[in-house]
């Protein structure tokens, strides 16, 4: 039986599935672009459910095309647009709001507030990041402050956060694995790079 490595390459404008053989040579690629949403100036959003559906359908497509099944897969890797932020209901898997993309600038005002409060050194020393709307933490704050469903789910202890890799892993495993890795976590402005743990 032929064996392959499957890579989910979830980018800013498209999702792609790549199969590599055991020599790490590309065997096949399938790809699909998805819609970008620009509801206000400086805002950029994605539909995380659409991304999940595309990834799932692309995996099915590459399996059908090459007459493969899960037994042909050695392992799965995920690359993604790291700072893009998804918050979802852990019971249903449904996002409470569209994914806020790394390019989005809606949290600039909150960032300026943190800078005025002299939080730059504290945050930099813990995360290695400058205060900027580019990173996930300020996007999370915006969703919690502006989406009533998010606050409701926090009270019920049913709100999950993740970068896109985390959301896809959670969906791929039927809601059993809520994980990311240090490379993604370190772009959230919530991860302490000295302790290699989420900061409090």
Residue ranges and their predicted role:
Residues 1-97, 109, 125:
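N-terminal glycine/serine-rich phosphate-binding loop of ATP-dependent small-molecule kinases
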Residues 10-12, 123-200:
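Gly/Ser/Thr-rich active-site cleft segment
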Residues 64-71, 92, 118-120, 148-159:
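Short, glycine- and charge-enriched coil/turn segments that flank and shape catalytic ligand pockets
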Residues 90-94, 117-127, 143:
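Acidic/polar active-site rim loop that often engages polyanionic ligands
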Residues 104:
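Carbohydrate-associated surface elements
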């Amino acid at each position: 039986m032929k064996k392959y490595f499957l890579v989910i390459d979830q980018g800013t404008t498209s999702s792609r599935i790549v199969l590599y053989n055991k020599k790490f040579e590309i065997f096949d690629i399938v790809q699909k672009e998805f819609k970008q949403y620009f509801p206000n100036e400086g805002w950029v959003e994605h539909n995380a459910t659409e991304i999940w559906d595309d990834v799932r359908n692309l995996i099915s497509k590459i399996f059908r095309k090459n007459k493969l099944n899960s037994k042909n897969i050695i392992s799965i890797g995920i690359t993604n647009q790291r700072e893009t932020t998804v918050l979802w209901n852990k019971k249903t898997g449904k996002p409470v709001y569209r994914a806020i993309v790394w390019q989005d600038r809606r949290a600039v005002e909150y960032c300026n507030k943190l800078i005025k409060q002299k939080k730059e050194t504290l945050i930099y020393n813990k995360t290695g990041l400058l205060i900027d709307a580019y990173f996930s933490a300020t996007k999370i704050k915006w969703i919690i402050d502006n989406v009533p469903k998010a606050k409701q789910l926090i009270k019920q202890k049913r709100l999950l956060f993740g970068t896109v890799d985390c959301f896809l892993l959670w969906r791929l495993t039927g809601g059993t694995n809520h994980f990311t890795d240090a490379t993604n976590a370190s772009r959230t402005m919530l991860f302490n790079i000295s302790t290699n743990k989420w900061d409090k």
